[in-house]
Amino acid sequence: DWKRMNGGDKIQTQISAIISQYNFEQPGASVPALVTLYRAIKNLPVNSWRDKKLVETQELIEACAALFSEASTGQENVIQGDVLNLSFFLNKRNDVKATLKHIRLDNFDSAFNVPLLLNTNVTFNTTIQVAPDKKISQPYWLIYPKEEGIFDVRDQTMIGKAWNDAPFIAAYTVTIEGEDFCIKRPVQYKYVDPAKGELYQPLVVLPQVESSFTRENYVSLNGALLP
């Protein structure tokens, strides 16, 4: 109940007005009022409830603006210390004022200041150098050696997750109706299946493996094992 919070009465009034004036045929018309609501919530004292409602309000703004964004790669996996090819994509399908200001990802940072036109694709391709010590992708219960009869899971917040957190997160800074929003998207492996179309799956980070030989030449007869 917003009335329990200091200044919550005005916010409740704004929410009621947005709901009553919402037009499902033109959801973009609600974006200016939602941005005003977002600013009002942001001015409240910092607490978990405020932060939760900011996230939810931003999600509503993105949905009503029909703003689609993704970060993808054509590589199924990448090795520590290797190069990762990236593709960024944005499209705004409703008529609201929006501008792409920045895209950030690890050591990559690029300024754009590109107005997002109605239903016009904005694409950008680049490559980044993966850090040699980048955390590899593996089940969270195998990060540490197994103890007798039990797995050593030191980060209890990981328990129950179907997938690990994405190793790379792209952060788009988009200005909507004069307010800056940070929109985060995981970098996913994107490919096309002839029958199913575009598909996504988590990007995997593999460890760097090096090998060396003790002799210059090896000869194996009929696939026999070498000594």
Report the location of each language-model feature.
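The feature marks non-catalytic terminal segments
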Residues: 1-62
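Structured, charged N-terminal subsegments at the starts of enzyme catalytic cores
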Residues: 14-17, 86, 107-111
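Low-complexity, acidic Ser/Thr/Pro/Gly-rich terminal tails and inter-domain linkers that flank the onset
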Residues: 38-82, 108, 190-226
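Hydrophobic residues positioned within well-ordered beta-strands of beta-sheet architectures
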Residues: 69, 86, 101, 124-126, ...
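Short edge beta-strand/loop segments characteristic of extracellular beta-sandwich folds
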Residues: 85-93
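Short acidic, flexible loop segments centered on an aromatic residue
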Residues: 93-110
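Low-complexity "stalk/linker" and mucin-like segments enriched in Ser/Thr/Pro/Ala/Gly
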Residues: 109-121
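Eukaryote-biased detector of low-complexity, proline/serine/threonine-rich segments
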Residues: 119-186
